[in-house]
Amino acid sequence: MAPVEVKGLWHRYRSANADWTLQGIDLCLQPGELVGLLGPSGCGKTTLLRLIAGFEVPSLGEVRMHGQSVATAQRWLPPERRGVGMVFQDYALFPHLTAWDNTCFGLRRGQDTSRAAWLLELLGLERLTKRYPHELSGGQRQRLALARALAPAPAVVLLDEPFSNLDVEVRLRLRSELPAVLNRCGTSGVLVTHDPGEALAICDRVAVMQDGVLHQCASPRTLVDAPASPFVGRFVLQANLLPVQRHGSDRWTCLLGALQRSKIPSPRVEGGDAEAGGLPPAASDDPVLLVDPAAIELSPDQQGDACVMGREFLGREWLYRVEAGGQQLRLRLPLHHDYRRGTRCSLALRSGEDVLLFPDRIGLTLAAQPLQ
């Protein structure tokens, strides 16, 4: 039975003329699964987490846990009766309690503390049990917050951007350990993050949100291979969105050249309608191409209609910003492609690369013959 199931969830805060913060969210968390809620600031992911936790009452829809209804607009079960653990980005530890007392805080009086001791050892804190939060590093405090959340053996732990206040090395180490810790504890998890790399790296599935709408909930591989909307491709992959013109039944043109239908089957959205989350209709019926930054090749050309506007060094490659056709594109190129700002150039789709056409959701590739 699903630890968490969200059905038709709508929510808005009680202020004058408030817009909907969540719009028709459907989501199901499977046992032992870690699901990421991914999206830009203000998209509603933390609100959704708070509704699951019981800190907010939904305006419409329902939250169910293990088949039991815990929240509707008329009926609401308080957080302490839902059997969930919470981990916040600011740790929320009790400053006057030691690491041991913080870990045991959620246990019932007289409850066995052996699990708390096991968790502290699992998280590498067994020698720090007598220290207070101010005597711990940021990474140690977040480990302690996780131990406290897991000590009562919740079926679900909810994590609200738990790594955002940590330095890079500690953040990478902790996030890589999280799935194994949850697995050892037999606990499912919901992770809020605005970092696509973080969500793709550790989550079993990722729910991509924008303006209160769930665009797609799928495995990381499916999000990369078959994004359900231009927004998913843009936010998750940092892909380029290009206008495209259709010519007849099987030819298209864009600023990267002439295109034809790819021989690769059209990608299938994973999850089906039950996980679509009320995906809104496209803002326009105009076709648009989703193009990976690594799928575009650049050639210096004094007569070219594109211009290098800037670049960022990414260690093993450059990320170029190129203006073409009145818009800015992102290109990922190897380090030997050394072009300065102001360089005139021509752009083309790399041979053998595929791009995704919306709203049709079919794959296109470079045409074998130029359009006549």
Where is each model-derived feature located?
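The feature captures the beta-strand-to-loop junction immediately N-terminal to the Walker
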Residues: 38-40
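Helix-to-loop junction immediately C-terminal to a conserved catalytic motif
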Residues: 53
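Conserved ABC transporter NBD signature motif
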Residues: 61-72
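ABC ATPase nucleotide-binding domains
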Residues: 83-85, 89, 93, 98-231
